[in-house]
Swiss-Prot record:
Function: Catalyzes the methylthiolation of N6-(dimethylallyl)adenosine (i(6)A), leading to the formation of 2-methylthio-N6-(dimethylallyl)adenosine (ms(2)i(6)A) at position 37 in tRNAs that read codons beginning with uridine.
EC number: 2.8.4.3
Subunit text: Monomer.
Catalysed reaction equations from the record: N(6)-dimethylallyladenosine(37) in tRNA + (sulfur carrier)-SH + AH2 + 2 S-adenosyl-L-methionine = 2-methylsulfanyl-N(6)-dimethylallyladenosine(37) in tRNA + (sulfur carrier)-H + 5'-deoxyadenosine + L-methionine + A + S-adenosyl-L-homocysteine + 2 H(+)
SMART domains: Elp3 (SM00729)
Protein name listed in UniProt: tRNA-2-methylthio-N(6)-dimethylallyladenosine synthase
Domain Radical SAM core span(s) in chain numbering: 207-437
Top class in the EC scheme: transferase
Domain of life (superkingdom): Bacteria
GO molecular function: 4 iron, 4 sulfur cluster binding; metal ion binding; N6-isopentenyladenosine methylthiotransferase activity
Record-listed [4Fe-4S] cluster 2 binding positions: C221, C225, C228
């Protein structure tokens, strides 16, 4: 839904008049509910690009004397969205706070990828109910991917009526209007665009620190894997223009950032929606590598769209890091077909072979789902054998979690939970075994570490990450924070490395 369509739509009441209860009569304010059916549609409307975002004069000062708090769940994209919302809050005059007790506005920026993530949010709403009761003027909002689901909005309406506002992933730029409406309205304000919005540039951001920065390069996903809710909650693929991305990265470099991560639900599809030119992720990376910033990463990749040109560009090295997160999900071609991943085991292994041939020292990590409907013991063994063959540095592993509205949710979940847990344990044992083996290879070596701060467990120890995203803990001066230093590894653990600074030099680049 672009701005014009939004204006034409007006206020929309729930379409389902046969629902258990018709809440539309209670709403005098904005009420645009989500629709997964509408979210499935991929229209041919051209994406509009807006470079003229600004806070309307009527909303300036809205936050004067008020504080905001945002709790973020889920992926890096949500963290990026939180940075944008924080920027809008600050532009409105709000002050950030780290305590819900001090906040005048609390937002939960939610994740819908798995049931466990949603349960955490509903649990948090339960905790915040008492806070809202003691402070009726508190504005409590739910945003992010969960808000795009009809079942979630209906549950909030029925079980958490003290929530003041709900909005989704496509209309973050309308936060000033929604806040104003929430202050004025006696009823819950709901505005969720089921269809994706335009690409809005020049949104304010409050970044977390000055060392590493997120740079969004595209929005949405068109892959429709049968288990995944993201194409519905994030909309169709829309790429930012390359000149906007390059300008943002240059600005971060000039501000002293040492590392940027390019973000997208499927970064490898970048540029496929451009109608006026042929330009992909490889072309963008080839431009960005010329910028004077030490490290550039990207996430998340889809094997189907990982092309040869990108591999050629990454092989040039320099500030383009050879750590690649390449989700496989399963090692069984039959399972991959049921998941609608659009590649098979052989195609994935062929891609891995190309990457390793071009970048022999590349570090590969992955995502794997166990217990997908109809997964047999033999098919699970194929996943284990693929993991051994590739020798991933690490993996995010999950038990299959049905998501309402996805094709897989209609499949019979016929793998017993006991079997799912056994498979997850066996997979995790293998992940730990290979990770420990690969980490052991670092002992005695000197690596470059981007120092992010003090260790969470010991303030006398500094912590940072290597180019291959290995966590390193070491003793060093506090002025090393924010710099890239050389560290000699003395001891390898399963998930981290311990070392000492090599020599007196602090910054190596």
């Amino acid at each position: 839904m672009n701005e014009k369509q939004k204006q034409e739509s007006g206020q929309v009441n729930p379409a389902d008049k046969t629902s258990e209860k018709d809440y539309s009569k209670y709403f005098e304010a904005v009420y645009i509910p989500p629709s997964l059916k509408d979210a499935k549609k991929r229209g041919k409307e051209s994406v509009q690009y807006h470079n003229d975002f600004k806070i309307s004069e009527e909303f300036k000062g809205l936050g004067e004397g008020r504080k905001f708090y945002i709790r973020t769940y889920g992926c890096q994209m949500n963290e990026h969205d939180t940075e944008v919302m924080a920027g809008i809050f600050m532009a409105l005059g709000y002050e950030a706070t780290n305590s819900v007790d001090d906040a005048n506005v609390i937002l939960l920026n939610t994740c819908a990828i798995r049931e466990n993530a949603e349960n955490k949010v509903f649990g948090e709403l339960g905790h915040l109910k008492a806070l809202k009761k003691n402070n009726p003027d508190l504005i409590l909002g739910v945003c992010g991917c969960m808000s795009q689901e009809e079942s979630v909005v209906n549950r909030i309406l029925k079980k958490h009526p003290f929530v003041d506002m709900i909005f989704g992933t496509h209309n973050i730029h309308r936060l000033p209007e929604l806040l104003s409406e929430a202050y004025l309205s006696k009823e819950m304000v709901i505005e969720v665009w089921s269809k994706e919005g335009d690409v809005i540039e020049n949104l304010p951001k409050v970044r977390n620190g000055k060392i590493k920065g997120w740079v969004n390069i595209m929005y949405g996903c068109d892959k429709f894997c049968t288990y995944c809710i993201v194409p519905y909650t994030r909309g169709k693929e829309r790429s930012r223009r390359p000149e906007e991305i390059i300008q943002e990265v240059r600005r971060l470099a000039s501000e002293g950032y040492k590392e940027i991560t390019l973000l997208g639900q499927n970064v490898n599809a970048y540029g496929k929606d451009f109608e006026d030119m042929t330009y992909g992720l490889g072309d963008l990376m080839d431009e960005l590598r010329k910028i004077d910033i030490p490290r550039i990463r990207f996430t998340t990749s889809h094997p189907r769209d990982f092309d040869d040109h990108l591999i050629e560009v990454l092989a040039k090295g320099g500030n383009l890091l050879d750590h690649i997160h390449l989700p496989v999900q399963s090692g069984s071609s039959a399972m991959l077909k049921m998941m609608a991943r659009k590649y098979d085991r052989e195609r994935y292994l062929e891609l891995v072979g190309k990457i390793k041939a071009a970048m022999p020292n590349a570090s590969l990590t992955t995502d794997i789902i166990v217990g997908f409907p109809n997964e047999t013991d033999e098919q699970f063994e194929e996943t284990l054998s693929l993991y051994r063959e590739v020798e991933f540095d690490s993996a995010y592993t999950f038990i299959y979690s049905p998501r309402e509205g996805t094709p897989a949710a209609k499949m019979k979940d016929n793998v017993p939970m006991r079997v799912k847990k056994e498979r997850l344990q066996r997979l995790n044992d293998l992940v730990k075994e290979i990770s420990a083996k690969k980490m052991k290879e670092y002992e005695g070596r000197t690596v470059e570490v981007l120092v992010e701060g003090e260790s969470k467990n010991n303030p006398d120890i500094l912590a940072g990450y290597t180019e291959k995203s290995k966590l390193v803990n070491f003793k060093g001066p506090k002025d090393a924070i924010g710099k890239i230093v050389r560290v000699k590894i003395e001891q390898a653990k399963t998930w981290s490395l311990d070392g000492v600074m090599a020599g007196e030099a602090i910054e190596v680049k």
